[in-house]
Amino acid sequence: MIIEAKSAVINREIRNDVKIEVIDGVITSLEAVGTPDRIIDGTLIPGFVDIHCHGGAGHYFGSKNEAEIQKVIDIHRANGTTTMLASLVTEPLDALKEQIKRLLPFVQSGAIAGIHLEGPYLSPHKCGAHDPALLRDPVPSELQELLDVADGAIS
């Protein structure tokens, strides 16, 4: 596919009147030749990377419903986010493990880049929206349990 745009951000510079070739979702040329398949009347920019994302448009990564998790991903994709971590808030350890298990297939498929655990190991004096009653000091065996369940998905 050849995409033509009035301008594009490439290597930290704005270039005018560009044609970019994309094959299988990968940019293969920044100076494509040929008739464009798509013309963008604007500026083409790289996708957004969100490393702290709990959800979007009323949907939440901590949901027990996989369809709702997919809606979060779809909403972000439709608005320019190409890479994201699913952030989870402080919960009891068993609930966190279940949330991680639900998110794991989305990580394995590449739909999300990984899982961000925002708690439960936070200072009760700077816990933001987290329930202070659920915060606790890190325990190596608990951390290992979370890492084992996540199978490399915690980022």
PLM regions with names:
Residues M1-I45:
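Histidine-rich, glycine-flanked metal-binding segment
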Residues G62-N65, L135-V139:
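Short, conserved glycine- and acidic-residue-centered signature motifs
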Residues K71, E98-P105, S141, E145:
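Alpha-helical scaffolding segments of alpha/beta enzyme cores, especially the outer helices
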Residues H54, Q70-Q99, A111-S123, A150-S155:
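Divalent metal-dependent hydrolysis catalytic cores, especially in the metallo-beta-lactamase
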Residues H125-L135:
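Glycine-rich phosphate-binding loop of ATP-grasp-fold ATP-dependent ligases
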Residues V33-P36, R136-S155:
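Histidine/acidic residue-rich metal-binding segments in metalloenzymes
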